[in-house]
Amino acid sequence: MGAAVGTVLLPWRGRARPLFAEASRPVVFTDVTAAAGLLPATNVSGSPDDKQFILEEMGGGVAFFDYDHDGWLDIFLVNGSSFDPKVRDSKPTSYLFHNNRDGTFTDVTASARLLHSGWGQGCCVGDYDNDGFDDLFVTYWGRNVLYHNNGDGTFTDVSDKAGVAGSGTCWGAGCCFLDYDRDGHLDLFVANYVNFDPAKAPRPGQSAYCRYNAIPVPCGPLGFAGGTNILYRNRGDGTFADVSEASGIARPRGPSSMVFVSSNWQPSGSYGMGAAAADFDNDGWPDIYVACDSAPSLLYRNSHDGTFREIAVPAGCALDENGVALAGMGAGVADYDADGWLDIVRTNFSEQVTTLYRNHGGGFEDASIRAGLGVNRKYLGFGVDFFDFDNDGWKDIFIANGHVYAQIANRKLHLTYRQPKVLYRNAGNGRFADVSATAGAAIRAENLGRGCAFGDFDNDGDVDVVVNNLDGPPTLLRNDGGNRNTAILIKCVGTRSNRSAIGTRVKVTSGNHSQIAEVMSGSSYYSQNDFRLHFGLGRSTAADIVELAWPSGLKETFRDLAANHLFVIEETKGIVNSRRFGSR
């Protein structure tokens, strides 16, 4: 594809002097769940106190996305079901909350026609038909669902027509839209976890794989056969073709039958959980990373010809520094050390270290311990991502924690069932400091955290967090104080590229400090972040240079963009709208 270069000079402000200094007062996160009206959205995932199966433990994802394009982030919370007939027959659904622009949300699930009930798992967002409204994909144990956004506040289930419902027998986990062939139409990747059948699965304590510290617990994933990942190619007519085999995504392959292997267990399939697509090797093509549970994680490198090669082991992002496959849960992607290469953070099981894979351009290295992430080993992490919570220009890390075994809740162990969240601040020198103790009571509050998403829901210039908690209401964490430093938000709109601009890379430079970010669909644990890219600017009054590389190959440059503004940039048309933070 040919690359055009356009430079636009804008009279926003004079060139700024960045001062990436630490704020004098700590940034705190305030739990505004009740005030925002989100308390009724209680998660259902089997029996809260007597879980018998692994399916009941995993919880669901969450999305920050602007479904009605009014400029304000709405919230979608994935919900599960139950094996209790009374609960199952009540048909619990996922939730969609509309942002009222005043700090509150309204439940619009019914009016939006999002009433599918089942064992919901993950979600991802992308405008697959390029009509200007972002569509929603939800994974399930069972039939997956693609909701077409009708543009009038309602959605239509087009899963069967589009050809992405799946077999109805798989356990869909993380997902992401991506334009892997760069034809302008969003394709879809779905990770499948394990082959699970409650009629065949043993109960707690019935196998060596069903005990934890000698306590009978639900079985898995060890002993279960892993699932097979799926890649759907968008035909451009509203339908998708399953190209998993032809593209190489179906490897490693799991068995077709839903079996539990009680002895002589060997990993088979992927055991895929969190998934994220981004350009890890800076060749202009999206690759796919999958966090895998108790098996080597996967990195599918895009070969530019419609196929992928799985290279995680030689690339250095499959195992930990000791060559051990950890129990990967969620995955976040960003350039935390500002060297121009996208890095990966992955949550793991309790008594394992959250893994930080530093991308050095020739592959990845496990930088977890020297970066300071080894201080918290007793937590079981799920949702995770990089975000700049204090607007100092460096990507920090947030982790939503919570154990999976309800059976340990009343035991006097070194571990707890409900767990606090963790916030790491990036020191700008390759190391992180745990600042959870000073980040507010809401961070320290103990929950069963699962999926989490990041975005500026109140449009005040700092990044907020929403967490989908197992067996309870979500937690909406408002960032209070991050905007004492300045920032800009960049919303990209594709024309030659896909309309959601997924895969667009943006580079922002202030003074001698540069940051990169990509528009991504799906990351964290089964979740979707705000498509608008956030760049903290410290004390700068403007971003000196903003460079965009679109999936189409077009490159555009803008100069002197005022801080504390949202800029909407449309491919080939430049800045089509701007708005100061705090305005409506």
Which sequence ranges carry the predicted segments?
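Gly/Ser/Thr/Pro-enriched helix-cap/hinge segments flanking short amphipathic alpha-helices
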Residues: A36, G363, A371-G372, H414-R584
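N-terminal export signals
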Residues: M1-R17
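Short, conserved, GDST-rich strand-edge loop motifs in beta-rich repeat architectures
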Residues: V78-K91, V194-G223, A400-T416
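Repeat-based blade/solenoid architectures
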Residues: L38-G61, A112-C124, V164-C176, A225, ...
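Beta-propeller blade termini
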Residues: G59-H69, H98, G120-F133, H148, ...
